[in-house]
């Protein structure tokens, strides 16, 4: 497997600078926070009360670590990351810049006048071991239960994962994909770039599902395989003609079905 060999070899050349001091003097560490003596805490990091930070953790500058967060051993958190209260992060995880984990889920209840009232989001986000989150990833906390990201999941830049989602082990989610609250993704799935997942009621994927780029998934998938719904590009004039034909499919189908059957 040459590609795997390349991946392993490339890690030997990765440069990770070591700061001159373990905890920058501008960092703010709250009461009862338990920070391992091997952890590296960058400039202007805020660590709130009751946080637990494991062995060999690196937190870069301007991060906010909320009350009660637990960060496992050897986690690497890049600059400007926000972990809301009670987030649980496993061992050997990586979170890249600008990601926000544990923000309130998007839940509102309308009244008889069409006004929307917020639903308190009382759960948390639980992230397993060896999870990698790209830059600008947003994962909302659960409404009652937790949002769960299992071991080995890899998430590309600018992905949104809604409240109470559950992503199975070793699933890959590519850039700009988004999933509505309550979505359940099985193990070893591949969600390609720009995929949107959401419909009437929560969507569920079985294990080993691949969804190609720009697909819109509106119903659950219970058979492993590759699924597509995005339309590939074509010359603009041809695309317009095809779009017009698509809008007339119902009419054309009725005409075909209404024709008398030939006797032969």
Where are these regions (language model features)?
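Short, basic phosphate-binding NTP loop
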Residues: 1-26, 30-31
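Generic structural signal for well-ordered, non-membrane alpha-helical segments
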Residues: 2, 124, 249-252
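Conserved protein kinase catalytic domain
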Residues: 6, 10, 228, 240-243
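Structural signal for interior beta-strand "rungs" in well-ordered beta-sheet cores
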Residues: 22-235
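Long, leucine- and charge-enriched amphipathic alpha-helices
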Residues: 233-264
């Amino acid at each position: 497997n040459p590609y795997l060999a390349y991946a392993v070899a490339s890690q030997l050349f990765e440069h990770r600078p070591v700061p001159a001091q373990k905890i920058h003097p501008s960092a703010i560490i709250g009461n009862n926070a338990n920070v391992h003596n091997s952890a590296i805490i960058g400039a202007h990091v805020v660590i709130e009360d009751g946080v637990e930070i494991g062995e060999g953790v690196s937190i870069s500058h301007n991060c906010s670590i909320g009350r009660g967060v637990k960060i496992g051993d050897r986690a690497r958190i890049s600059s400007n990351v926000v972990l809301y209260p009670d987030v649980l992060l496993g061992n050997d995880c990586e979170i890249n810049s600008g990601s926000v984990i544990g923000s309130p889920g998007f839940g509102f209840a309308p009244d008889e006048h069409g006004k929307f009232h917020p639903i308190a989001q009382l759960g948390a986000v639980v992230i397993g071991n060896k999870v990698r989150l790209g830059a600008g990833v947003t994962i909302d906390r659960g409404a009652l239960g937790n949002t769960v990201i299992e071991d080995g999941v890899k998430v590309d830049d600018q992905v949104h994962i809604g409240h109470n989602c559950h992503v199975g082990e070793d699933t890959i989610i590519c850039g700009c994909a988004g999933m509505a609250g309550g979505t359940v993704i099985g193990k070893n799935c591949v969600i390609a770039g720009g995929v949107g997942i959401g419909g009437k009621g929560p969507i569920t994927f079985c294990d080993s599902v691949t969804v190609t780029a720009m697909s819109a998934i509106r119903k659950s998938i219970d058979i492993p395989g590759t699924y597509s719904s995005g339309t590939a590009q074509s010359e603009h004039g041809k695309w317009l003609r095809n779009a017009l034909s698509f809008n007339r499919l119902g009419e054309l189908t009725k005409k075909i079905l209404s024709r008398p059957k030939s006797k032969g």
